[in-house]
């Protein structure tokens, strides 16, 4: 803990987009006017009751919010400790939490008069959500996706194409999420006049980390109300998986100033922390990537290392800057789960709850298996079930040799 504790953990970022030493906006000169225009447009939209009312209407009638808070009775019984609840973001339209943020950004793009939307995607869920909203609002959609992810997430590639998006496979680097984001940024620099870049996580240059967090905070806001109804009090702990970290930030942020609530973020440990992994907090150091300063996987020369996770949505070599800050000030405890642990949790959830989770939240569920058993039976733990696992079935079957 090497930074001064604030009066509130929810007051950041400052006017230049910093969370302590993290965040900021490190962008090409060409993009700076656009970034400043975006910041201004977002500030105006946030203060406009009509924008909020329109967004709430779509969240209710199109996305299907509020998503349920579900007591996972058999998993609770299996672990024999804490009471486990799932926040069912997998039941949203498009199958994950991504749509909460995309709706907000696409409404903002319309407000700014930008007819062309670009996005990056890893697991494909952000791409699907962006393609969905572009179809709904009649906007052109281009999605950049690493060629490796195109291969392992075919169902989502087909969904994007069915929705009218152009999917551009990226073959540079490791051909995964980082490389897709690089290409999207290149496109944006070239087409600033008519293009809006819809970033899928709490990363990128300010105001993106703040904006994406605000659009995702509906998750935690609903949990506060739902857990009061179910248990009559706030939860004792929250847990979520973290790649860039938007699903986690959406759950965590409304609870950051509740000191009684323990908060756990779970990174992807891949083949193990001494081998190939995607755990930026556990194995990284501060550096600058994609417009912000955060913890990154880097070699001794400061070059970005390739991340690995069985989950296409977690294999990013960085983490959102607000998460980096929350780690440094000690408000959130970060842990990591390996590919094997995530697969075991995936199978357990399928068999005990009749819920096929995405491999991303399966990482968080793996750590629930470590945390929950020794806790008292009245301890209330909420896991963010951030997406459904249809997209991962072929990949899981391949890893398990076809034997579920």
Swiss-Prot record:
Q: Which reactions does this protein catalyse?
A: (1S,2R)-1-C-(indol-3-yl)glycerol 3-phosphate + L-serine = D-glyceraldehyde 3-phosphate + L-tryptophan + H2O
Xref: SUPFAM superfamilies:
Tryptophan synthase beta subunit-like PLP-dependent enzymes (SSF53686)
Molecular function (GO) terms for this protein are: tryptophan synthase activity
Cofactors demanded by this protein? pyridoxal 5'-phosphate
- Pathway participation: Amino-acid biosynthesis; L-tryptophan biosynthesis; L-tryptophan from chorismate: step 5/5
Q: For the modification N6-(pyridoxal phosphate)lysine, which residues carry it?
A: 98
Residue ranges that the Swiss-Prot or TrEMBL entry lists as coiled coil: none
According to its UniProt record, the EC number is 4.2.1.20
What keywords would UniProt list here? Answer: Amino-acid biosynthesis, Aromatic amino acid biosynthesis, Lyase, Pyridoxal phosphate, Tryptophan biosynthesis
Give yes or no: UniProt keyword tRNA-binding.
no
Which GO cellular component does the record give, naming just one?
cytoplasm
What broad class of enzyme is this? lyase
Family annotation (NCBIfam families): trpB (TIGR00263)
Q: Which family does it belong to?
A: Belongs to the TrpB family.
Q: Give the record's subunit note.
A: Tetramer of two alpha and two beta chains.
PANTHER family, sorted: TRYPTOPHAN SYNTHASE, TRYPTOPHAN SYNTHASE-RELATED
**Reported function:** The beta subunit is responsible for the synthesis of L-tryptophan from indole and L-serine.
What is this protein identified as? Tryptophan synthase beta chain
Q: Write down the species.
A: Rhodopseudomonas palustris (strain HaA2)
Q: Gene of origin?
A: trpB
